[in-house]
Amino acid sequence: MELMINSHPDLEGVLTRRTAAKLKVLSKGYYVKGTSQMNNAALVCAVTDALKEPDRLSELLLVVDPQTYTLFRRASESPDPIKVKDPGSEQYRLLDDFCYLVCADTPDGLVVSVPTQIRAAFEQLKNDGFLKQKDRFDLLHNYAMAAIHLYGAI
């Protein structure tokens, strides 16, 4: 869990608190080249650049479950960190592991926030029509699941 200094942390600040091993795992997941020769500062810059790509965020948000997407969207659009209703759930953990969300323990419970650079990437996606694309993708997914359940019952 990260300490929340302000309502929306800086992505580089979040990444600098990660270990070199975790940064290397993230960089491999984001297809960053030449990480074996990079020091921590270079890894932070490379992973930050990879995370700021709107297409990468779009790919992830299209395939996450509806509850996780709703949590991300609420946290992204909220001016303040939002409280996680069920801290035992897995909704926030995937996005926290990928550094798209920042979690913090507060006296009121677990809160999540979206780093400013990720918020900017999500805003760009929304301006480019991502919300309509997400709605169509979810509709197709629901039709496919309904067909699977229908044919499974026959």
Predicted ranges, named:
Residues 1-154:
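Type-3 copper protein
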